[in-house]
Amino acid sequence: MTETPNTSSEEIQTSEPSPDNELQVLQQENANLKAELQEQNDRYLMALAEAENSRKRLRKERTEMMQYAVENALMDFLPPIESMEKALGFASQTSEEVKNWAIGFQMILQQFKQIFEEKGVVEYSSKGELFNPYLHEAVEIEETTTIPEGTILEEFTKGYKIGDRPIRVAKVKVAKLPAKGNSDSNEEKE
């Protein structure tokens, strides 16, 4: 019988945690909770950053969509404006009555150009400039030895841009040096 009580006191001693063991367990739990809190905090900050990035991206996309919508609307006005400019160019060759009408149309044309300016649309001149495929479309090439190759000889349609970005490239005639084979065959014919 004496053995039984000894066994139970040993069991009691092992089942009751010592203050050192209890402290270690609490410290471990504390470390685990801190790590979990840090992980949750990191997730929260990541979600917050993603939400902010999404807001910025949506704001930028909305601005770009509005800009492209304005550009497309303005592009639709370019052909009639250019036609009006050409027609007004001939107004000086007509009667006084037509010249008076032309003054009114000139005012309307100026209003259109003012709207374009307010929206940041500017026309650019190409004649005499070097050909730039970003700003020009070569619709005609003329062989010449008097003008440097790549120089724009004539502008058929004006180019327009907003900032540095063209919204319509200029259609131009570009100078090109004659091919060497062509000059040899011309000399043989003579």
Curated annotation (Swiss-Prot):
Skewed-composition ranges (Polar residues): 1-18
Ranges for region Disordered: 1-21
Keyword Cell wall biogenesis/degradation: no
GO cellular component labels: cytoplasm
Location in the cell: Cytoplasm
Molecular function via GO: adenyl-nucleotide exchange factor activity; protein homodimerization activity; protein-folding chaperone binding; unfolded protein binding
InterPro entries: GrpE (IPR000740), GrpE_coiled_coil (IPR013805), GrpE_head (IPR009012)
Keyword annotations from UniProtKB, A to Z: Chaperone, Cytoplasm, Stress response
UniProt superkingdom: Bacteria
Matches recorded under Pfam families: GrpE
GO BP terms in the entry: protein folding
Role: Participates actively in the response to hyperosmotic and heat shock by preventing the aggregation of stress-denatured proteins, in association with DnaK and GrpE. It is the nucleotide exchange factor for DnaK and may function as a thermosensor. Unfolded proteins bind initially to DnaJ; upon interaction with the DnaJ-bound protein, DnaK hydrolyzes its bound ATP, resulting in the formation of a stable complex. GrpE releases ADP from DnaK; ATP binding to DnaK triggers the release of the substrate protein, thus completing the reaction cycle.
Subunit and interaction comment: Homodimer.
Family under the similarity heading: Belongs to the GrpE family.
Protein name, per record: Protein GrpE
Organism listed in the record: Chlamydia trachomatis serovar L2b (strain UCH-1/proctitis)
Species classification: Bacteria, Pseudomonadati, Chlamydiota, Chlamydiia, Chlamydiales
Gene coding for it: grpE
